[in-house]
């Protein structure tokens, strides 16, 4: 039988695994990527594209769905979200040789994401990757066209990307 007496906080209520100083440093490091992200998007914008696809598997797919909903409600840019395994199985007729696939991987070695990158390149599309772990398969030159290498803060990186695409499209007054 479980009772409430079996569980007591040693130091009162607290957030487990929350380390304020480390988390602030990590977020500030991700925010410092803004200029690099903007340079990449400027290049993508200048080269031209027809669609933006946020593609992921697992938690990255969840992050991709959030940013797609965010953009869809605020932008006229053609933005889509795909589950990597489904894309590999069924494809998407909207994805062309002028499309951009934006993805993220913590390990840099996720099988579905590796196969996805190969499929995108086979179609002729471009890959903009956020990879957390250096010296992995997805950091190799043939596995991405644009690379940001920085751990954690996937959603922040995706939202900075979305916001700058919308800024380039004249969808922010400031």
Q: Where are each of the predicted segments found?
A:
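Cofactor-/ligand-binding subdomain signature composed of acidic, glycine-rich
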Residues: 1-47, 165-174
């Amino acid at each position: 039988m479980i009772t409430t007496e079996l569980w007591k906080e040693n130091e009162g209520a607290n957030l487990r695994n929350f380390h304020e100083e480390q988390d602030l440093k990590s977020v500030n490091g991700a925010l410092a990527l803004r200029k690099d992200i903007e340079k990449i998007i400027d290049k993508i914008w200048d080269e031209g594209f027809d669609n933006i696809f946020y593609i992921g598997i697992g938690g990255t797919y969840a992050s991709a769905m959030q940013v797609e909903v965010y953009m869809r409600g605020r932008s006229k840019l053609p933005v889509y979200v795909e589950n990597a395994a489904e894309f590999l199985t069924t494809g998407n007729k909207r994805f062309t040789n002028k499309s951009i696939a934006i993805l993220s991987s913590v390990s840099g070695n996720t099988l579905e994401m590796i196969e996805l990158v190969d499929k995108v390149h086979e179609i002729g599309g471009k890959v903009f990757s956020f990879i957390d772990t250096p010296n992995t398969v997805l950091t190799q030159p043939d596995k991405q066209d644009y690379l940001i290498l920085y751990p954690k803060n996937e959603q922040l990186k995706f939202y900075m990307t979305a916001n700058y695409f919308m800024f380039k499209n004249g969808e922010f007054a400031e």
